[in-house]
Each structure stands twice: as C-alpha cells, then as structure tokens.
Design a protein with these regions (language model features):
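A generic local structural motif
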Residues: 4-8, 55, 68-71, 103-104
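Vicinal oxygen chelate
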Residues: 15-24, 54-61, 65, 71-99, ...
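Structural motif
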Residues: 8-11, 34, 74, 118
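A common structural junction motif
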Residues: 37-40, 100-104
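Short loop/turn motifs at secondary-structure junctions and domain boundaries
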Residues: 107-110
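Core segments of cupin and vicinal oxygen chelate
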Residues: 11-14, 20-64
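N-terminal beta-strand motif that seeds the catalytic metal site of vicinal oxygen chelate
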Residues: 2-30, 79-82, 132-134
C-alpha cells in the first residue's frame, strides 16, 4: 500500500471555488448580477474548438468564491454544479479513478485551466479545476 497506491492518497482539493447556476440567457444573467447585485465580472471567455462556448463568472468585490453563469448542459435546464480547485488536476483525477469514481478525461483549451468533469452519485456535476493559487 503506501503513497504509491492512489486509493490511499489524500485529496488534493483545497477549495470550493465556483458555484454554477444554469441560466436561460447569459447576457441577461450578467446584467442582473452586475447591475442589480453589484457583482463584478471575474471571467468572460469564449472557448471550444470554434469559440462556441462562453465561460462567465461573477463575484462580489473581494470574494474568493465565484458564481459561474452557465447555459443549460445538454440543452436541458437544471442540474446543480460546483467547481472545486486543486493544484494538481492529474493527481486528483488518478486518485478518484482509483477509487472507482466515474470521471471524464482532463481537458484544456487555450486561455482556460486544465480541468475534468465528474458527477456525484445523485448526478450533480463537479468541475475539478487546476489553479496555480490552490
């Protein structure tokens, strides 16, 4: 056993960094959170092969946690998600996979951090995101 056994390794996750809401219209949600709630934009990035996706994060000034405003996944509204942060996405991926957790393969696009998606037993989405500050 020992540390070479990934099932015995401690978690590398250090923070719940992002809560994710599914919104019908990212621009309308952005206007609400910035104009009415006083949040600031933390990220607004196009990604994907043809820039077809938009990652949009807002937060209250000074907050370390962010709120992502996501379009519906798989064209269906609903479904909760959180983003958790780790300094080593690949180590956490290996650890969870060794424990029998179904995880998607890590992915990275220019301008976005390396990450992978997984679900808890109830189907809630969890994005495991590599951060240099985690």
């Amino acid at each position: 056993m020992g540390m070479s056994d990934p099932t015995q390794a401690p978690t590398t996750v250090t923070n719940i960094g992002v809560a994710m809401f599914t919104v019908a219209d990212q621009n309308a949600a952005l206007a609400f959170y910035t104009e009415k709630m006083g949040f600031e934009v933390r990220a607004d990035v196009a990604f994907g092969e043809n820039g077809e996706y938009r990652w949009l994060e807002v937060a209250p000034p000074g907050s370390t946690a962010r709120l992502a405003l996501n379009p519906p996944m798989n064209d269906e509204p609903g479904g909760s998600a959180i983003g958790i942060e780790t300094a080593d996405v690949h180590a956490e991926h290996a650890r969870l996979k060794a424990l029998g957790v179904e995880v998607e393969e890590p992915m990275s696009s220019p301008g976005t951090p390396t990450m992978f998606m997984m679900r808890d037993p109830d189907g809630n989405h969890i994005a495991v995101v590599e951060t240099s500050g985690a």
